Amino acid sequence: MTTAHPAEAMFAADEASRSLGIELLEHGPGRAELRMTVTRAMVNGHGIAHGGYVFLLADTAFACACNSHGPVTVAAGADITFVAPAHAGDVLVARAEERTRFGRSGIYDVSVRRGDEVIAEFRGRSRSVGRATGDAPKESQ
């Protein structure tokens, strides 16, 4: 029996992302690529994809990339710049790449694209919490 890669194990347990139809396409050390189709339920009052869903896609790619090294890693912060609108039916691909890791921290950039067009640019800052993927969090004292 083989053990799932840390990014695969984390994504398999991510009900929020999987329930939106997000798919993990590829992953490797410090990188991940995910895909999501914008549904009618993801469109806001302006007729464009709600920024929260675009952020969620980018954040999920970030999570897969920063958890690819093994220890459980969480977001310490993130910023997003929306470059172009997405619409119902658009297929978005988020590619996350590690820029640097230092100590228990890291910096990751994620580009969200519709084909060749950039929809959003995301920068995430990560922090390793030091437990293995799948371990239960320690209860606070």
Residue ranges and their predicted role:
Residues R18-L20, G30-A32, V72-A78, D90-L92, ...:
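A generic structural signal for short beta-strands and their flanking turns/coil linkers
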Residues L25, G51, F55-L56, A88, ...:
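Short, electropositive, low-hydrophobicity segments enriched in small/polar residues
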Residues M1-R35, T39-R40, P137-Q141:
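Non-catalytic linker/capping segments at the edges of enzyme domains
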Residues A63-V93, E98:
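Hydrophobic beta-strand-centered segment that forms part of the acyl-chain substrate-binding groove
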Residues A16-S19, R35-A61:
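Hot-dog-fold acyl-thioester-processing enzymes
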Residues R35-T37, R95, D109:
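Beta-strand residues in well-ordered beta-sheet regions across diverse protein folds
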Residues M1, P85-A88, E97-Q141:
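HotDog/MaoC-like acyl-thioester-processing domains
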Residues M36-V38, F82, S128:
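Hydrophobic residues in beta-strands and at strand termini
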